[in-house]
Protein backbone atom coordinates (compact mmCIF):
# COMPACT_ATOMS: atom_id res chain seq x y z
CA UNK A 1 0.00 0.00 0.00
CA UNK A 2 1.23 3.53 -0.75
CA UNK A 3 1.62 6.05 2.04
CA UNK A 4 0.79 9.73 1.46
CA UNK A 5 1.83 12.36 4.00
CA UNK A 6 0.62 15.94 3.83
CA UNK A 7 2.18 18.98 5.47
CA UNK A 8 0.71 22.45 5.38
CA UNK A 9 -2.34 24.54 6.02
CA UNK A 10 -5.74 22.91 6.26
CA UNK A 11 -8.83 25.08 6.02
CA UNK A 12 -12.38 24.80 7.29
CA UNK A 13 -14.40 25.97 4.30
CA UNK A 14 -17.95 27.25 4.53
CA UNK A 15 -19.54 26.90 1.08
CA UNK A 16 -22.46 29.27 0.51
CA UNK A 17 -24.67 28.83 -2.56
CA UNK A 18 -26.29 32.07 -3.76
CA UNK A 19 -28.40 32.71 -6.87
CA UNK A 20 -26.15 35.66 -7.77
CA UNK A 21 -23.76 38.00 -6.01
CA UNK A 22 -25.58 40.59 -3.90
CA UNK A 23 -25.02 44.29 -4.28
CA UNK A 24 -22.82 45.87 -1.64
CA UNK A 25 -24.52 46.82 1.63
CA UNK A 26 -27.57 44.58 1.08
CA UNK A 27 -28.82 41.28 2.51
CA UNK A 28 -29.51 38.06 0.66
CA UNK A 29 -30.71 34.65 1.74
CA UNK A 30 -28.41 31.78 0.74
CA UNK A 31 -29.92 28.85 -1.13
CA UNK A 32 -27.82 26.47 0.98
CA UNK A 33 -24.57 26.22 2.88
CA UNK A 34 -22.29 23.50 4.20
CA UNK A 35 -18.91 23.10 5.81
CA UNK A 36 -16.09 21.03 4.36
CA UNK A 37 -12.40 20.49 4.87
CA UNK A 38 -10.37 22.40 2.32
CA UNK A 39 -6.99 23.49 1.11
CA UNK A 40 -4.70 21.59 -1.26
CA UNK A 41 -3.17 19.35 1.42
CA UNK A 42 -6.46 18.27 3.02
CA UNK A 43 -8.13 17.74 -0.35
CA UNK A 44 -5.20 15.68 -1.65
CA UNK A 45 -5.01 13.51 1.47
CA UNK A 46 -8.73 12.74 1.44
CA UNK A 47 -8.53 11.85 -2.27
CA UNK A 48 -5.55 9.56 -1.60
CA UNK A 49 -7.38 7.85 1.28
CA UNK A 50 -10.48 7.34 -0.88
CA UNK A 51 -8.27 5.66 -3.49
CA UNK A 52 -6.91 3.24 -0.88
CA UNK A 53 -3.65 4.89 0.16
CA UNK A 54 -2.58 5.21 3.76
CA UNK A 55 -2.88 8.97 4.33
CA UNK A 56 -1.58 11.08 7.20
CA UNK A 57 -1.73 14.80 7.99
CA UNK A 58 1.22 16.39 9.80
CA UNK A 59 0.56 19.92 10.90
CA UNK A 60 -0.81 22.31 13.48
CA UNK A 61 -4.52 22.77 14.16
CA UNK A 62 -6.43 24.74 16.77
CA UNK A 63 -8.70 23.18 19.37
CA UNK A 64 -11.46 25.60 18.30
CA UNK A 65 -14.55 24.61 16.29
CA UNK A 66 -12.65 24.77 12.98
CA UNK A 67 -9.83 22.52 14.16
CA UNK A 68 -12.28 20.08 15.71
CA UNK A 69 -14.21 19.93 12.45
CA UNK A 70 -11.03 19.20 10.47
CA UNK A 71 -9.93 16.38 12.82
CA UNK A 72 -13.39 14.76 12.56
CA UNK A 73 -13.41 15.21 8.78
CA UNK A 74 -9.99 13.57 8.43
CA UNK A 75 -11.11 10.63 10.61
CA UNK A 76 -14.32 10.28 8.58
CA UNK A 77 -12.23 9.71 5.45
CA UNK A 78 -9.52 7.60 7.09
CA UNK A 79 -6.75 10.21 7.19
CA UNK A 80 -4.50 9.69 10.23
CA UNK A 81 -3.84 12.63 12.54
CA UNK A 82 -1.52 11.01 15.12
CA UNK A 83 1.28 13.46 14.28
CA UNK A 84 -0.97 16.53 14.24
CA UNK A 85 -0.45 19.08 17.01
CA UNK A 86 -3.69 20.51 18.41
CA UNK A 87 -3.09 23.80 20.21
CA UNK A 88 -5.28 25.86 22.55
CA UNK A 89 -5.77 29.59 22.29
CA UNK A 90 -5.42 29.94 18.51
CA UNK A 91 -7.82 30.59 15.60
CA UNK A 92 -8.17 28.10 12.76
CA UNK A 93 -7.63 28.92 9.09
CA UNK A 94 -11.18 29.40 7.74
CA UNK A 95 -12.70 30.49 4.46
CA UNK A 96 -16.12 31.52 3.22
CA UNK A 97 -16.71 30.59 -0.39
CA UNK A 98 -19.65 32.11 -2.23
CA UNK A 99 -20.82 30.02 -5.17
CA UNK A 100 -22.90 32.04 -7.65
CA UNK A 101 -25.38 29.99 -9.69
CA UNK A 102 -25.92 32.83 -12.19
CA UNK A 103 -22.24 33.47 -12.91
CA UNK A 104 -21.05 29.87 -12.33
CA UNK A 105 -18.24 31.39 -10.30
CA UNK A 106 -16.87 31.44 -6.79
CA UNK A 107 -15.49 34.12 -4.52
CA UNK A 108 -13.41 33.24 -1.48
CA UNK A 109 -12.79 35.34 1.61
CA UNK A 110 -10.41 33.76 4.10
CA UNK A 111 -8.96 34.25 7.57
CA UNK A 112 -5.57 32.55 7.94
CA UNK A 113 -6.05 32.36 11.70
CA UNK A 114 -3.06 32.76 13.98
CA UNK A 115 -1.59 29.28 14.36
CA UNK A 116 2.19 29.14 14.75
CA UNK A 117 4.28 27.44 12.07
CA UNK A 118 4.94 23.72 12.34
CA UNK A 119 8.22 22.74 13.99
CA UNK A 120 8.89 19.12 13.06
CA UNK A 121 9.64 16.69 15.86
CA UNK A 122 11.44 13.34 15.41
CA UNK A 123 8.21 11.32 14.94
CA UNK A 124 6.95 13.70 12.30
CA UNK A 125 10.30 13.59 10.47
CA UNK A 126 10.20 9.79 10.54
CA UNK A 127 6.68 9.77 9.06
CA UNK A 128 7.77 12.12 6.27
CA UNK A 129 10.86 10.06 5.43
CA UNK A 130 8.71 6.90 5.30
CA UNK A 131 6.18 8.40 2.90
CA UNK A 132 5.87 7.31 -0.72
CA UNK A 133 4.19 10.61 -1.59
CA UNK A 134 4.61 13.98 0.10
CA UNK A 135 2.01 16.72 -0.35
Predicted regions and their residues:
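Short secondary-structure boundary/capping elements
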Residues: 36-43, 88-91, 115-120
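Active-site-proximal loop->helix
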Residues: 65-77, 97-99
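Glycine-rich phosphate/adenosyl-contacting loop at the front of the ribokinase-like
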Residues: 1-60, 65-69
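Conserved phosphate-binding/catalytic loop of the ribokinase/pfkB sugar-kinase fold
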Residues: 86-87, 97-135
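Short catalytic-loop micro-motif centered on adjacent basic/acidic residues
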Residues: 56-59, 83, 133-135
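A glycine-rich helix N-cap at a beta->alpha junction
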Residues: 73-90
